[in-house]
Amino acid sequence: MSVRIVDVREITKPISSPIRNAYIDFTKMTTSLVAVVTDVVREGKRVVGYGFNSNGRYGQGGLIRERFASRILEADPKKLLNEAGDNLDPDKVWAAMMINEKPGGHGERSVAVGTIDMAVWDAVAKIAGKPLFRLLAERHGVKANPRVFVYAAGGYYYPGKGLSMLRGEMRGYLDRGYNVVKMKIGGAPIEEDRMRIEAVLEEIGKDAQLAVDANGRFNLETGIAYAKMLRDYPLFWYEEVGDPLDYALQAALAEFYPGPMATGENLFSHQDARNLLRYGGMRPDRDWLQFDCALSYGLCEYQRTLEVLKTHGWSPSRCIPHGGHQMSLNIAAGLGLGGNESYPDLFQPYGGFPDGVRVENGHITMPDLPGIGFEGKSDLYKEMKALAE
């Protein structure tokens, strides 16, 4: 049976919104949608793998077209196959993409590679005729758990958005089955943020927990001031206080904030993850890690990151990835992560779950769809299918 990649296609799509966090607005936000087209036919249709990058980092069409897609297409197809020769080997495809790339500088490059890598894994699981989460569990010798914790990310700053709108937004998430919600902080003065937090806590009561996210906005002084304010409240976590690479700042905060903290969404390699665990003072009994495979060289690299965690005494259950996409849902279900982010009202059609999947008591159950399961989300698959045709 022939198995080869015959084309890699990319289109940059808008996911813009008038929202903002403490650091950026999303008025010009884009994503790269990628199709990895193979010559394999299943049920009368050519197998195509799909991928896209997470929000917060822009589409990477230039890098994808100029460097990474061409390297895959120029490679000897036989050198991209597994030992049996009946499927692609994602690690070999990944290695082909990274030929002549120097180490370090994990920025936009990691997003471009991660986007293609997502599409490759989608194709691999489809060729195998299995949901990706079950394929991953088999490869790692663990039992898949299709029930995955999800939390609702929102609470952005928005023109004209007062406390009543913020409360209504959070109540809407609870009405849809979520029991952990997240809001932004750091984009307003600390006393205004305190009022916003108290309004949300009053709204959700004992029905849910609240996480807050500073998006890396604070210096140490401000981060400590917020820590002293936030420790008065029973928060799910205090997220990304300062610059993602300022490990000393992160380590210093533990003295002032005994509750759970979370970070990692803007660290894009297993080396950066290792430095966070070495120098960031993260506590494996309470803190959370948010590495996002779509932004950090893909699932091939994410598996290396999980190995780093293991050597430092961390469980994969302390990982709740950023991004709100189905790829991380599959990793969570297949490899035992602690859950996944969700954007119920934002960045559509790329976020969310397959049609018919509902949140119940803060969890969803993964359907048994081949690959990542994009075909089960009709509005998203419409965009993907148009790229592949």
UniProtKB/Swiss-Prot annotation:
Its EC number is 4.2.1.81. The record marks 55, 182, 341 as: Transition state stabilizer. It holds the Pfam family MR_MLE_C. Its cofactor is Mg(2+). Binds 1 Mg(2+) ion per subunit. Substrate binds at residues 21, 55, 102, 156, 182-184, 213-215, 239, 265, 322, 341-343. This is D(-)-tartrate dehydratase.
